[in-house]
Amino acid sequence: MHGVFLSAFEYQISARVGSFSRIAFNQSIINSKKGIYPTGSYVTTTGALQIDSSLLPKGIESHKLGFGVGGEIGALAYDSTKFLIDEANPKAGFQPANWYYMGRWEGYLMQYSEKWTREQKAQNARPYVLYNLYLDYQYKDIFGIKLGRYPSKALFLSGFNQGFEVFYRWKKFKIVWFSTFGRALANEQYIRDFYAPVNYKQKINYGMHNFNLIYENKYIRIAPFIWFYPKNFNAPGFEITHDTKSYWKSLWRIQTTFYAWFPLYSDYLSKDYYRAALVGKKSASLFVFQRVHFRSYRFGWSVYKNFGNGSAQLGWNGSPVDPFYDTKDDTPYEDAYSNFYNANSITINAFVGKSIKNLLVQLYGKLTYSPRADAQSLGVTFKYDLKKHIYFMLMVNGYQITMHRGYKVGFFTSGYNPDFAQTIQNRSYLMSSMSYRF
């Protein structure tokens, strides 16, 4: 819906309603002593409304000033975990977990994550968020600044940012500064109010910051960067991308990208544990992928490797691997994170797909190996745009996780424990979503 007011200013109103569901094949009991948990099934209903406007008269072409506000509200229409009891500790009460997807709120600094029971977390869920509230100024394509709450395009922050970013472009070079003091999620699958994605000892948020220097021509993109959080970590890295789209006039398009980043952790953080592995002082992560398009076909592959605990602070709030993997497709009793976040893990992925008019069919496979757990999955996804405003998605994924001896599902606070037996758990599921947008 578009409009013009005062004969000079433009605005756009957009809205969507939708639902997301995951039907898990594993509906087991909970036994925390043995590390046995169900995958969890749930169905959401959501609705969002957004207004974006231009605050400058149309006649001013070199300058742009935008403003936007938007919010979303949702609910769990079905939750298979709502009344589950832990057989190993029935006095602990109900053990709901799907609040993780719809309304997770454990304090801005995550200060209640260890203090509240699962039932208290369900009771304190906030299935609503004001995800957009921003000002965006640009001068031509040379300089720009954006601040407030808005969709994040940053490499290591998915969802919505609460902060600011600035860019300056000179010829083929671009400098970008990005700062975040909060992250939120707002879609059919997740609603999460703004919280500090990284904090200092759950006492204060100094903000996570990023500086990029980008050089780009029609053949190559080279982007050294550094991400840092005061008193926690510094993570220099770089991206190199080659894409044939801009210079090869062909039915083929081949994109190859290589990322590397090297988190260096502070003394206090290096002595902590992340996903049952000591964080340590030094680490590295490498990610390489290739995507190929030919006519209506697409296929590709990727490899993601952690050396040490590269995801302890950077990566699990968003990373370049997100478009390739559903990074939160495990049980919510593991905080839903896939095992490629584990220390010293390696993940190999491949996919092939075809578009048929408004239908996309894609087959994909994923293998993860790590000291803590191995995972294998093979799935197929169907995406169909019924009309201009109606969208459907269906995904069937066969998924198995083997927790190695010495590690246990949902247990992250210390390292190898020989008392923990190996478990093999089915994480297969059927996912679907539908939405109406205008």
For the regions a language model picked out, list residue spans one by one.
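Outer-membrane beta-barrel translocator/channel fold
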Residues: 77-78, 176-237, 241-324, 344, ...
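Beta-barrel outer-membrane channel/assembly domains of diderm bacteria
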Residues: 1-145, 168, 381-386, 392-397, ...
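Extracellular loop and loop/strand-boundary signature of outer-membrane beta-barrel proteins
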Residues: 32-38, 119-120, 149-152, 193-200, ...
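Short loop/turn motifs that connect adjacent beta-strands in outer-membrane beta-barrel proteins
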Residues: 1-11, 52-67, 142, 172-174, ...
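Residues that define the transmembrane beta-barrel architecture of outer-membrane proteins
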Residues: 9, 41-47, 126-131, 158-162, ...
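Surface-exposed coil loops of outer-membrane beta-barrel proteins
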Residues: 95-134, 138-214, 221-223, 228-230, ...
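C-terminal structural cap/anchor segments
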Residues: 301-389
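Residues on the lipid-exposed face of transmembrane beta-strands in outer-membrane beta-barrel proteins
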Residues: 47-53, 133-137, 164-168, 211-217, ...
